[in-house]
Regions:
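Enzymes that bind and transform nitrogen-containing heteroaromatic metabolites
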Residues: 1-137
Length: 137
C-alpha cells in the first residue's frame, strides 16, 4: 500500500481535526499517481476531488481498514503511524510553509527517501513531493 500525506514545514499534519490546507492541482496529481489502483480516502477528503475524473476513488470513513496491498490511501487529519506496517511506500507532499498544527508526523526510522520533486500547485507556489520506501531489514 502507498500512503499519501500532506505536511507543513514543521511536520504539521492537521489542526483541530481539520486539514491545514488544500490544493486542486495536488488532488489532480494524487489522482494521476494512483490511476492504476484504488485510491482510498475518507468521505471528507472526497470533496477535494470533485470535478476530477478519477473513477478509482473509494471514499468511506473506515477506509484504512479495507486497504489492500496495491491500494493508494490519501490520509488526512490522522496519524499514519498505525498503518505504516502495512505500507510499502509513503509519499509526503510538503506545503512549503507553516500552518497552525496540533497533530504532527515525522517520517520514522526504517524509511528511505528515494525521490524528491517539486511542482506548482493552484494555491501554493511550490509543493514538494518526497517518496519513501520501507527499508528491508
Amino acid at each position: 500500500m502507498t500512503i499519501f500525506i500532506c505536511l507543513d514545514d514543521a511536520d504539521g499534519l492537521a489542526f483541530n481535526h481539520r486539514r491545514q490546507s488544500r490544493d486542486r492541482i495536488l488532488c489532480e496529481h494524487i489522482a494521476a499517481l494512483s490511476q492504476k489502483g484504488v485510491l482510498r480516502m475518507n468521505t471528507s477528503s472526497f470533496s477535494l476531488f470533485s470535478g476530477i475524473n478519477a473513477l478509482n476513488i473509494c471514499a468511506e470513513d473506515d477506509f484504512m481498514q479495507h486497504a489492500q496491498p496495491d491500494d493508494f490511501c490519501f490520509l488526512e487529519c490522522a496519524d499514519p503511524t498505525p498503518y505504516l506496517g502495512s505500507a510499502s511506500c509513503l509519499t509526503v507532499f510538503r506545503w512549503n510553509r507553516c500552518y497552525p498544527a496540533d497533530l504532527h508526523f515525522s517520517v520514522p526510522e526504517g524509511w528511505k527517501k528515494v525521490r524528491e520533486t517539486e511542482f506548482e500547485g493552484s494555491s501554493h507556489p511550490t509543493i514538494t513531493q518526497e517518496d519513501y520506501v520501507k527499508c528491508e531489514n
